[in-house]
Amino acid sequence: MRRFNLRSLRFGSDSEAWRSLPVETAPFVFGGVEYVVPGGVVELELDAARVDDQLTLKAHLETEIEGPCQRCLGDARVPVEASGIDYVRHGDSEGAEFDDDEDEAPEGYARGFVLDVERWVRDLIGEALPLQIVCREDCAGLCPTCGADLNEDPGHTHEE
């Protein structure tokens, strides 16, 4: 799912609605290296509250990112949890269409009643990524001289 029609939300008597949305997620390039969400799909939990002419949208996701460790190049799998809020006023960008070729991202993630869930998920994950993706916190990395994995041979040395 790339986009979600907000009109499909069914609000209860408390003017709130909830949906779980499967969102396809493209690979991320981080530090010149590609990282993926296992299975390529993230479950986005979407809560919506309606007050007068405004919708408050709250998004939450929990997933993992996998790819090479940035220290030893072994396999790394990092948990990612992220939340965000967006607001939609009735009439804002009413009838406006998304332009996938826009140079600048629009403010917010909704145009009229269409929510760009793919872009919101990408932004949430990107903002929640750690500064360095590692296989484990104490990863020793690679030998700067020969490239040996120092996790496999912690006593690794070179004759001088």
What label would you give each PLM region?
Residues 1-160:
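Structured interface patches
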